[in-house]
């Protein structure tokens, strides 16, 4: 019997015998007929739970719709949309992480909102506005804690992943008490979060193994105005970009006693100074084997770096100023999108030959790319055309197109099992 029909049986148990005896025979027959109809029609909804999907979540994902404050839940196997969830606030610079069972997504909005959504029910579980202006977040190694980094008033707040109740508030102030914006928040091994203080020029690491007593380690004087950061896929290196000077600041999380080191001294040297909002995302770095591919600043180039010694080993000329440089799972290809006004184009680099092997134009304002877990397809958001497109990564053919309202970030549940994502 259909499970919803089984639930309907409980309706009979709740009707007292005295009620049946009080009914005339005809009325009693009509009432029993009505209950029988409820029993045999499984589609009748008696609870919100009855609307939820019964399926796995490993091939699900979300698409951020930045203009409407909504998110689409998508089926990446069928290449279709399952739900649209509304009421998520300002998603103009939104990002997301997933619970370790990949059922829930946590959406970090620009307005300070933290939203927990249910991917199987297509519903908003809870939303809290925890600050005035936030810029991303992370989920802990064991999936029990969600952290949010804030511009206003600064600092990091940490929440219980189940209830979204706050468990820690970590102010971001320097030694003189001046508040700082927080950027580059990531999860790290050892139940830690690592983040950067933009105004104070610090990297901080917080150990959350005992949520009641967070242990914060500070690394001062890393450089001027660190604007973004990343953690390498193995969880070892945390690297911050500097807006106020050239080069990068790197912390080896396996050997933190060595402190912060400077690498790639020429990184950041463009033909002209760029405003911080045009600086490339460091999360857009790609790792393919021991090679790291990263967007050059102010140049139409992708830099190639040997991660064994963090020395530059090559440059690849590309179509425009790179924004995201994304590695296909397996590392054979790197896909690149570009800043305005050349943001209608995507290029593909072969990581063996270090050559551009394909160039195409998905449409107006390509914002984000997300690969399927094994890399056979890539999803691309095209904001100004209001679509998400799906491409075969071998033949470079378009396989599907889904309508979306000003789509930006695309996030698949495979991220639930990867450090720093």
Stretches with model-predicted labels:
Residues 9-10, 45-47:
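Glycine-centered signal
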Residues 3-22:
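N-terminal amphipathic/hydrophobic targeting modules at extreme N-termini
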Residues 46-421:
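Predominantly soluble domains enriched in secretory-pathway, periplasmic, or organellar proteins
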Residues 29-42:
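Bacterial N-terminal signal peptides
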Residues 13, 20-21, 39, 211, ...:
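Compositionally biased, intrinsically disordered/low-complexity regions enriched for serine, proline
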């Amino acid at each position: 019997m259909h499970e919803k029909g089984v639930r309907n049986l409980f309706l009979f148990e709740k009707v007292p015998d005295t009620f049946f005896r009080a009914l005339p025979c005809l009325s009693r027959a009509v009432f029993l007929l009505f209950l029988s109809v409820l029993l045999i029609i499984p589609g009748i909804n008696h609870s919100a739970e009855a609307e939820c999907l019964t399926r796995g979540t490993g091939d699900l994902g979300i698409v951020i719709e930045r203009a409407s404050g909504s998110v689409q839940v998508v089926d990446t196997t069928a290449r279709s949309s399952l739900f649209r969830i509304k009421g998520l606030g300002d998603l103009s610079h939104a990002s997301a992480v997933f619970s370790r069972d990949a059922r829930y997504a946590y959406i970090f909005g620009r307005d300070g909102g933290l939203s927990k959504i249910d991917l199987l029910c297509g519903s908003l579980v809870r939303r809290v506005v925890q600050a005035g202006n936030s810029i991303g977040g992370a989920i802990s190694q064991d999936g029990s804690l969600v952290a949010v980094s804030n511009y206003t008033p600064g600092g990091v707040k940490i929440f219980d992943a189940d209830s979204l109740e706050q468990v820690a508030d970590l102010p971001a102030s320097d030694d003189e008490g001046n508040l700082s914006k927080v950027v580059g928040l990531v999860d790290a091994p050892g139940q830690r979060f690592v983040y950067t203080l933009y105004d104070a020029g610090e990297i901080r690491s917080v150990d959350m193994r005992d949520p009641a007593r967070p242990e914060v380690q500070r690394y001062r004087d890393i450089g001027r105005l660190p604007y973004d950061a990343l953690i390498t896929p193995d969880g070892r290196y945390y690297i911050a970009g500097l807006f106020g000077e050239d080069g990068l600041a790197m912390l080896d999380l396996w050997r933190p006693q060595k402190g912060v080191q400077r690498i790639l001294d020429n990184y950041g040297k463009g033909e002209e100074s760029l405003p911080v909002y045009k600086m490339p995302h460091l999360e857009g770095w790609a790792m393919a084997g021991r090679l790291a591919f990263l967007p050059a600043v102010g140049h139409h180039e992708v830099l190639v770096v040997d991660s064994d010694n963090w020395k530059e080993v090559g440059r690849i000329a590309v179509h425009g100023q790179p924004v995201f440089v994304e590695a296909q799972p397996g590392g054979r290809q790197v896909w690149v999108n570009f800043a305005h006004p050349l943001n209608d184009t995507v290029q593909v680099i072969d990581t063996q030959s270090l050559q551009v092997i394909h160039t195409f134009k998905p449409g107006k304002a390509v914002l984000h790319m997300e690969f399927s877990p094994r890399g056979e397809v890539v999803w691309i958001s095209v904001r100004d055309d209001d679509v998400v497109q799906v491409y075969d990564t071998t033949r470079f053919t378009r396989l599907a197109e889904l309508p979306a309202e000003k789509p930006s970030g695309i996030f698949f549940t495979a991220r639930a099992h990867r450090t720093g994502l």
